Regions:
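His/Asp/Glu-rich mid-to-C-terminal helical/loop segments that flank catalytic regions of hydrolases
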Residues: 146-160, 185, 298-332
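Single conserved hydrophobic/aromatic residue that forms the stacking wall/gate
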Residues: 2-9, 13, 330-339
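Glycine/charged-rich beta-loop-alpha catalytic/anionic-binding loops adjacent to active sites
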Residues: 116-130, 236, 299-302
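Active-site-adjacent substrate-binding region
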Residues: 88-104, 212-307
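Glycine-rich, mobile lid/loop segments that gate access to catalytic sites or pores
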Residues: 18-120, 165
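Acidic, glycine-rich active-site loops and adjacent beta-strand->loop/helix elements
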Residues: 30, 116-118, 160-168, 211-213, ...
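Metal-dependent peptidase/peptidase-like ectodomains
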Residues: 58-87, 167-262
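Alpha-helical metal-binding/catalytic segments enriched in His/Glu/Asp
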Residues: 7, 129-167, 321
């Protein structure tokens, strides 16, 4: 059998009845026991689908029916006669795709993904509907910005962590010591003393870049009456007294001045005070790497759905803000950092 699982953070029912591809890594036998080969794989086409139960057999569906992950999210690959069914049917397919022997596949970490193409939406095509806007928009903005970064008084660095949607607590997640140790090793390789390294680290600033919730036109009551971002008005600066967003007032001041100087559109986002919102890795990372932090990102509708919706110009604003940040000469005295 092929084990499968799902993330509790996604709207799982919206994955039903959609053509799904699979992508990830496959671990293959090698000549070295401690170094099995890792092969990356992406199907590039639909190979799975999760068929919904027809309404005739599920009359209560429009009243809200709980999804059972074990029962309702079992994907279908093919419909075969019973005599052709085999427990290693999927392994045979995977081996053929990778041009390896079936018995050499030791394990795999594969995810399903929606293969539908992005599409511009609207009379003037001001919106973009696409899978995986959370959080590939942030990754794309960071990658574009660091290439353009020109500052010479320090180090620009981006960290693209895994497992944010399931709590960050993995060796490759933001709750690990990976970022802290990596930065120390970089400074050590440049010949800096421990004191110089600590001063440079704690004199820095962290942008936690993840998406935000936009005002839903059909559910305006879900948002704060004064701090609700809308699609197309710029990226968001996110705040929370609970520190689920790690933003502090001085970090906001720095970012607002930067955006005002460069004429970059931005908005403020605060959850309704009686609604617990989501969180980002910012508060987790800044605990292990205690520097000024600000949570930012583009606003979305339909977050965590199979297709999400964004304003086209908001990405440009986010990328411009991060680029300006990577070009800024940081002159703050590290001694007053954690005021």
């Amino acid at each position: 059998s092929t084990p499968s699982n799902s993330s509790a953070a996604s709207d799982v029912y919206k994955r039903q009845d959609r053509p799904l591809g699979i992508a990830g890594r496959v671990i293959v036998r090698s000549g070295d026991v401690f170094a099995p080969e890792t092969m990356l794989y992406r199907s590039g086409r639909p190979v799975l689908i999760i068929p919904n139960l027809a309404i005739h057999l599920n009359r209560e569906v429009n009243k809200g029916v709980a999804i059972n992950n074990q029962v309702d999210l079992m994907p279908v690959a093919d419909m075969l006669p019973e005599e052709q069914q085999s427990t290693d049917y999927f392994l045979s397919f995977l081996a053929e795709e990778l041009a390896v022997k079936k018995e050499d596949i030791l394990d795999f970490e594969l995810n399903t993904y929606c293969v539908e193409e992005p599409a511009y939406v609207g009379i003037k095509e001001t919106l973009l509907s696409s899978p995986r806007l959370d959080n590939q928009t942030s990754v794309a903005a960071l990658l574009a910005a660091i290439v353009e970064g020109t500052r010479t008084d320090g180090i620009n660095l981006i960290a693209l962590f895994d497992n944010e949607e399931i709590g960050n607590t993995s060796k490759q997640g933001a709750a690990s010591i990976l970022l802290h140790d990596m930065v120390k090793r970089i400074y050590r390789s440049l010949g800096c003393s421990e004191e110089e390294t600590d001063c440079a680290m704690y004199g820095g600033m962290l942008l936690s870049v993840d998406v935000a919730h936009a005002l839903h036109p059909n559910h305006k009551e879900k948002m704060d009456i004064t701090n609700h971002p809308v699609l197309g008005d710029g990226f968001c600066i996110k705040e929370a007294c609970s520190q689920s967003y790690a933003t502090d007032a001085k970090a906001i001041g720095i970012l607002r001045q930067l955006c005002d100087q460069n004429k970059i559109a931005y908005q403020r986002f605060v959850n309704r005070s009686d609604v617990r919102g989501g969180g980002t890795l910012g508060s987790v990372a800044s605990t292990l790497f205690p520097v000024r932090t600000v949570d930012i990102g583009i606003p979305l509708l339909s977050m965590h759905s199979a297709r999400e919706l964004m304003g086209r110009t908001d990405f440009d604003a986010l990328a411009s803000a991060v680029t300006a940040y990577f070009c800024l000469l940081y002159t703050s005295d590290a001694a007053d950092e954690l005021d």
